[in-house]
UniProtKB/Swiss-Prot annotation:
Keywords: Acetylation, Cell membrane, Membrane, Methylation, Phosphoprotein, Repeat, Transmembrane, Transmembrane helix, Transport. The gene is PIP2-4. This is Probable aquaporin PIP2-4. NCBIfam families: MIP (TIGR00861). Pfam families: MIP. The lineage of its organism: Eukaryota, Viridiplantae, Streptophyta, Embryophyta, Tracheophyta.
Length: 291
């Protein structure tokens, strides 16, 4: 296979100083026989459980502190800023802790985006999503068990479309919010960037967590911020409210579209995967330097 080249404006093209990892096999049954897969699945389950436990407790605590009927005040509690920090901060911590074991997905949309980019296999994708959803259900279940008097009264942290917004607006918010998150994941874990700066792999959880924080600031007033189907599904299962289930499709369809769009944009536009494939025919070889 020909060696890819980078642009060198002052002379001939220079040899690429990094190497892309080979694409993951689409379907690999051999993977099911290996312990590292199950270790990664367990890590995804536990990480998603902890993520939902801390973040949903934060949401319910904020609502309890600002409930005027219970003596709360409007300016009490952590506010939307604090809720956003809880979600973003937990993602930062958990991605940092699990990146070396499972990749630190903690989100079916991230897993699907990486699958579409051939970063993970179908087997791993399915097992991760199941583990993430089960972890989310257990995390919300613990919240209800420990805060039963507040859980149902304050909505169980379930994602619902806010009054005054139509479903199209909610869907758009979820698509764009998830695009921001998954695009950040691709950028933070880009092998080209990792090869050229040894600090990037260590710092990758920071921009990912910060992306979650920023998206929450923007979309909490609209949908309560999903951008993670497992988070929305787990809360809906434990809260079991009709409106939460009626709006549930928004928190699956939106994030999956956003993840697919981010995967396409990063792989085929920024990394020019399509041009590199066509370059093997010769006529497009000059475009390889832009990858």
């Amino acid at each position: 296979m020909a060696k890819d080249l980078d642009v060198n404006e002052s002379g001939p093209p220079a040899a690429r100083d990094y190497k892309d990892p080979p694409p993951a096999p689409f379907f690999d049954m051999e993977e099911l026989r290996k312990w590292p897969l199950y270790r990664a699945v367990i890590a995804e389950f536990v990480a998603t459980l902890l993520f939902l436990y801390v973040s949903i407790l934060t949401v319910i605590g904020y609502k309890a502190q600002t409930d005027a009927t219970a003596g709360g005040v409007d300016c009490g509690g952590v506010g939307i800023l604090g809720i956003a920090w809880a979600f973003g901060g937990m993602i930062f911590v958990l991605v940092y802790c699990t990146a070396g074991i499972s990749g630190g997905h903690i989100n079916p949309a991230v897993t699907v985006g990486l699958f579409l980019a051939r970063k993970v296999s179908l087997v791993r994708t399915v097992l991760y999503i199941v583990a993430q959803c089960l972890g989310a259900i257990c995390g919300c279940g613990f919240v209800k068990a420990f805060q039963s008097s507040y859980y149902t009264r304050y909505g169980g942290g379930a994602n619902e479309l806010a009054d005054g917004y139509n479903k199209g607006t909610g869907l758009g918010a979820e698509i764009i919010g998830t695009f921001v998150l998954v695009y950040t994941v691709f950028s933070a874990t880009d092998p080209k960037r990792n090869a050229r700066d040894s600090h990037v792999p260590v710092l990758a959880p920071l921009p990912i967590g910060f992306a979650v924080f920023m998206v929450h600031l923007a979309t909490i007033p609209i949908t309560g911020t999903g951008i993670n189907p497992a988070r929305s599904f787990g809360a809906a299962v434990i809260y079991n409210n009709e409106k939460a289930w009626d709006d549930q499709w928004i928190f699956w369809v939106g994030p999956m579209i956003g993840a697919a769009a981010a995967a396409f944009y990063h792989q085929f536009i920024l990394r020019a995967a399509a041009i590199k494939a066509l370059g093997s025919f010769g006529s497009f070889g000059s475009f390889r330097s832009f990858a």
